[in-house]
Amino acid sequence: MLKKILVFCSILFAFQSMVLAQNEIVKPLTIGQTVTLKSKILKEERTLNIYLPLGFDKAKSYPVIYLLDGSMNEDFIHVSGLVQFFNQMYAMPQTILVGIANVDRKRDFTYHTDVKDLQKDYPTTGHSDQFISFLEKELKPYVESHYKTTDTYIFGQSLGGLLATEILLKKPEMFNNYFIISPSLWWDDQSLIKQAKQLLSKSPDTKKFVYVSVGKGEHPVMVKDAESIYDILKNSNKKNWTVEYKMMEGDNHATILHRSLYEGLVKMFPYKEPK
């Protein structure tokens, strides 16, 4: 008798599974698109992960965020969610996110150094000039030829923060808004910090938002360097620059990015109660 009950239950379960399978509809979940761009400057193909806001309209103009370390297995997915959240809950307009997937971030995000130990430990480094040229002459024109755009942002952390700082100081006109998280300004014996005042003296005083952040749990050199670049930027007498700083009390170098970007976006788009 027990055997018959078990057989009956097995048949019933199999039948229910078949019915459920017939009724379900499975579709892929898509949050963006992936584009392969052939770069003549870098002499390689580069992968772009692009998030378009809900209801994207080709006839409308949108701000664009350029995200360094923008691979699917890096920061693209969680930053896409942050952008969507700030559009839904805060005053952030609908925004396009362009994640730039890495090939060799040490090569692309660092400038030349004569420090022998760095040359030995990081043999491919020192080509940020080429990557910046790629951003300026190939990537941005590609994006602007496919979408109508307004303000531009660059998000960078660690070596990406070093690159974002280098662009801000040497080619500030490339972006309107700079989010510089835990920048590796120790690179090349802090030469970028040492040059900062001179470079800023040549920069036009056009409207900019600059956000610098570091985690309290990071190496003391990282904290000191972030504070130093913030102080230099804040005291540069740029009347049209908004310069913000945030010490992330509970974060270290590994945990800081998402929460710090959140805090930076809050400074740009503070919450307002709906009327």
Predicted regions and their residues:
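Bacterial Sec-dependent N-terminal signal peptides
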Residues: 1-24
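A domain-start/cap signature at the N-terminus of enzymes
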Residues: 19-63
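Short glycine-enriched nucleophile-adjacent loop
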Residues: 161-172
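Mobile cap/lid helix-loop segments that gate and shape the active-site cleft of serine hydrolases
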Residues: 170-207
